[in-house]
A protein has these predicted regions:
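Sec-dependent signal peptide recognition
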Residues: 2-9
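Generic signature of intrinsically disordered, low-complexity, basic-rich segments
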Residues: 10-11, 142
Length: 464
């Protein structure tokens, strides 16, 4: 009786013992072996109010001009010109500046001079005349054309030239048959031509560079997406294209073009900031922004999701043999698959190892397929618990290993949209929306998943 009893005890202990398999060593796959994400392009429809700077230009420019020409023989004159406020009209890439003004002119005429005591004197008393003195001043209409562009260093560049000059009220002196209109035009034009450079200098004060620099700085700041990780836009180049002017509201409209290498990481990354580069516009008519977002998820972070979301799975192999899958953890890569550590209990307990190919399904879930036993595990189970190699184990793990990426994607989208909506600096507002998000590819290294997503939407920038 005793031998039979001890034999049963040995069988029972053998059936319940822990299965021990040496964990496989994951292969090393460095990040440098991971293919680069596609470049991202952002097209920000930008609106900038120029009216405040035009008003400043008007207030800073001279309003009164005086000139004279004195000689003994012939006509001498003194003039005073005073302008009204500047009127600006926008048309595509030009600003037309209109000036209405009025002048008065004092003249004297000497038909001939002779020298007396070493000094030239008029031979007869000088004849005096005037226009716009003790009477309404004579009116003048002047216009300038300014061609506008944006320089490599984001300064508003204008090329202003005097266009139309019209004496509405000519000045003709009948007493000595002299038409002063050409003289006035010459003198007033000389003064007004000096305004060309001053108008250019004033328009260059529009704070395009400071606004662009502030936007550039803001877009380089990390965006915390709690509790999942951090988003980095990582802008690389910037350009301003398609500049056009609209008279209504006197605004400039242009497309701010950015290239970027965005990254989302479950861990904080130490990334260098990029200085504001030169203005380098791209030759494209695209208006929709497309982000190719690289998401770096460490295995530790994915394993935390697995611990949180994975429910214990019961697998019945036969009426007397069953196991409970208690925990699944990712160890790292092996060829084109990942090694999974499976902690189980039941008729047997312990840890065995599977290999599986990760993929992301159409519902944005991280799943596993082509699940199989790792070679060391298979060898061990063939000798100690062959029944565990049943296909049900692989099938149920494949069916139930599921990490929903939807929440992290929605939180990321919401955090990004929050960051791109609002006043980013005084008088500068950015707003936009993300209309589409889809998975592009999945890769993995020794320490993390690399998931590339494509996001698309529209962005707008408003500068007061």
């Amino acid at each position: 009786m005793k031998p039979h009893f001890f034999y049963c005890i040995i069988l029972l202990l053998s059936a319940c013992r822990t299965i021990e398999v040496d964990p496989p060593a994951p292969e090393f796959i460095g990040l440098e072996e991971i293919s680069s994400a596609k470049p991202s392009f952002l097209f920000i429809q930008t609106e900038m109010a120029l009216k405040p700077y035009l008003k400043e230009a008007d207030q800073s420019l001279d309003k009164k001009f005086t000139g004279k020409s004195e000689q003994c023989e012939g006509v001498s004159y003194t003039y005073h010109f005073e302008r009204d406020p500047l009127l600006f009209k926008f048309k595509e890439k030009e600003v037309e500046t209109t000036i209405n003004g009025a002048f008065d002119l004092r003249l004297s005429y000497c038909p001939t001079c002779h020298e007396l005591f070493g000094e030239e004197r008029c031979a007869i008393p000088r004849i005096y005349a005037s226009c716009g003195v003790d009477e309404p001043k004579r009116k003048v209409h002047v216009s300038y054309q300014s061609k506008i562009g944006i320089s490599e260093d984001f300064v508003l560049r204008t090329k202003t030239q005097l266009g139309e000059f019209q004496l509405i009220d000519p000045c003709k002196i009948t007493v000595f048959q002299y038409d002063a209109s050409s003289t006035i035009e010459k003198e007033v034009k000389a003064s007004l031509i000096q305004l060309e450079k001053e108008i250019d200098q004033q328009l260059a004060q529009a704070p395009i560079k400071s606004s662009v620099a502030e936007v550039w700085k803001t877009l380089q700041e990390p965006i915390l997406v709690e509790p999942y990780g951090v988003f980095y836009l990582r802008p690389q180049t910037i350009g301003i294209a398609d500049l056009t002017l609209k008279n209504e509201g006197q605004k400039a409209f242009f497309t701010t073009q950015l290239t970027a290498q965005p990254v989302f990481s479950t861990n904080t990354l130490d990334l260098d900031k990029v200085k504001l580069p030169q203005n380098t516009p791209q030759n494209t008519k695209e208006q929709k922004s497309i982000l190719h977002l690289r998401t770096i998820a460490s295995y530790d972070s994915i394993n935390r999701f697995l611990i949180k979301d994975f429910d214990t799975q019961k697998i019945s192999i036969s009426p007397k043999k069953q196991i409970h899958i208690n925990k699944v953890q990712i160890l790292g890569p092996q060829a084109d698959r990942l090694v999974l550590a499976i902690e189980f209990s039941g008729s047997k307990k312990g840890i065995f190892y599977l290999v599986a190919e990760p993929y992301i399904d159409i519902d944005q879930h991280l799943r596993m397929r082509k699940v199989d036993f790792e070679i060391k595990t298979k060898s061990m189970l063939l000798h100690s618990a062959k029944w565990l190699l049943d296909a049900k184990v692989k099938e149920q793990i494949e069916a139930n290993l599921d990490v929903d990426l939807g929440p992290i994607l929605k939180e990321s989208q919401a955090a990004i949209e929050k960051q791109i909506n609002g006043e980013i600096s005084k008088g500068v507002w950015l707003n936009g929306n993300i209309s589409e998000l889809r998975v592009e590819q999945l890769q993995f290294s020794s320490s993390c998943f690399i998931i590339d997503f494509e996001l698309s939407g529209l962005l707008k920038l408003k500068i007061q």
